[in-house]
């Protein structure tokens, strides 16, 4: 679409159909409603890990089968994990020797 009809006259009648002045025409605004499409987000499932504590550490006797294990001769009950019989040499912060 030409906007020459919207330009001011360029002075005397031109010899050619031209104009040296800029011509800008602004049309009405358009409204568009953009609805977001559904987005599928996959969240990773939980990772379950298990670290059993059924080992005898520093046993001076053969491995016991049953509810009592020993570490350096001091019984360790199978109901939990305890290092209290090791005399404080091993804290929960250091790895125990193999």
UniProtKB/Swiss-Prot annotation:
Residues found modified as N-acetylserine: 2
InterPro entries: Keratin
Key words, A-Z: Acetylation, Keratin
Domain of life, source organism: Eukaryota
Annotated GO CC locations: intermediate filament
Any one GO MF annotation of this record: structural constituent of cytoskeleton
Record bears the keyword Acetylation: yes
Secreted found in the keyword field: no
Quaternary context: The avian keratins (F-ker, S-ker, C-ker and B-ker) are a complex mixture of very similar polypeptides.
PANTHER family with a match to the protein in the record: BETA-KERATIN-RELATED PROTEIN-RELATED
Family: Belongs to the avian keratin family.
Protein name: Feather beta keratin
């Amino acid at each position: 679409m030409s906007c020459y009809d919207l330009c001011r006259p360029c002075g005397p009648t031109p010899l050619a159909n031209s104009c040296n002045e800029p011509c800008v025409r602004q049309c009405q605004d358009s409204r568009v409603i953009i609805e977001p499409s559904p987005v599928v987000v996959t969240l990773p499932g939980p990772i379950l890990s298990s670290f059993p504590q059924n080992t005898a550490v520093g046993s001076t006797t053969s491995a016991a089968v049953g509810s009592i294990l020993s570490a350096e001769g001091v019984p360790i009950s199978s109901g939990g994990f305890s290092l209290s019989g090791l005399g404080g040499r091993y804290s929960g912060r250091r790895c125990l020797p193999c």
